[in-house]
Amino acid sequence: MPWIQMKMNTSGAQAEELGDALIENGAVSVTFQDTHDNPVFEPLPGETRLWGDTDVIGLFDAETDMADVIAGLEHHPLLGSGFHHKIEQIEDKDWEREWMTNFHPMRFGQRLWICPSWRDVPDPNAVNVMLDPGLAFGTGTHPTTALCLTWLDGLDLAGKTIIDFGCGSGILAIAALKLGAAAAIGIDIDPQAIQASRDNAERNGVSDRLSLYLPHQQPDNLIADVVVANILAGPLRELAPLISVLPKRGGHLGLSGVLASQASGVCEAYADLFELDAVAEKEEWCRITGVRR
């Protein structure tokens, strides 16, 4: 079934109000899109940030009388008669199949593959993590996840303990376990991430070696051979006193979720306790690694 799309441009301050107006006039969904394709990073908790120049896009059933919709919107105080808009028809697709075709097995480093369950494993003798996109962030497609996976693949993890701080889907902890780590601990503030990590660990046969905690549940005096935190620059700086003491002396630390432009500030927060390596970059993102002094 085809759909009808209406697009309007406005300021970020007015976008949500116009989105509500579209819903009130029959839109089945509303999305916000930056007119200039600039991302928004690290909104504060409880804050909905939109761009200064925002496209508000409403999706309508194909049978909708758009003349009635336009007439209804013209009464809105932000619009008025003759407001600027664009209407086009969009053909329907098999969105589930379309979505699935975008995910392929991906290789990281020399040994590690991340494979969606509906794809054949390219190399049965490699280290294969079976992982489908789901509730929690982390499938290997984002540059920060890729940087962390490549780093883990290059470490000797045999018999080691790893902490995945901000575990999301559990991809990093699970990859470490399949690369030879003896045990892993995943910590996340989101209960859905804890559940996603648990489900993914079971699917990969490593659930008996993965312990998962919300922050208030984690044991005191946690310590590990390897600590990885793929979160964001702000939390990495703020939580540096907590994260810095998780690796044992001589242990490895890997940090990502950091824009290359933010690297120096994050490095400064960890420089006292770690011998830091050169920053690794991928696209506009980076990874910071080091060894605990």
UniProtKB/Swiss-Prot annotation:
Give the enzyme class.
Answer: transferase
User: Where does it reside?
Assistant: Cytoplasm
InterPro entries membership: Ribosomal_L11_MeTrfase_PrmA (IPR050078), Ribosomal_PrmA_MeTrfase (IPR004498), SAM-dependent_MTases_sf (IPR029063)
Keyword Transferase assigned to the entry: answer is yes
**What are its GO biological-process terms?**
methylation
CDD domains tied to this protein: AdoMet_MTases
Keyword field contains S-adenosyl-L-methionine:
yes
Gene Ontology CC annotations of this record: cytosol
Gene3D superfamilies on file: Vaccinia Virus protein VP39
- One MF term in the entry's GO annotations: protein-lysine N-methyltransferase activity
Q: Which cysteines are joined by disulfide bonds?
A: none
Question: Which residues are S-adenosyl-L-methionine-binding?
Answer: T145, G166, D188, N230
Q: Which reaction does it catalyse?
A: L-lysyl-[protein] + 3 S-adenosyl-L-methionine = N(6),N(6),N(6)-trimethyl-L-lysyl-[protein] + 3 S-adenosyl-L-homocysteine + 3 H(+)
> Which keywords appear in this protein's UniProt record, sorted alphabetically?
Cytoplasm, Methyltransferase, S-adenosyl-L-methionine, Transferase
Supply the Pfam families for this chain: PrmA
Q: State the family named in the UniProt similarity comment for this chain.
A: Belongs to the methyltransferase superfamily. PrmA family.
The job of this chain, per UniProt, is described as: Methylates ribosomal protein L11.
Q: Please identify the protein, giving its name as recorded.
A: Ribosomal protein L11 methyltransferase
What is the scientific name of the source organism?
Answer: Erwinia tasmaniensis (strain DSM 17950 / CFBP 7177 / CIP 109463 / NCPPB 4357 / Et1/99)
Name of encoding gene:
prmA
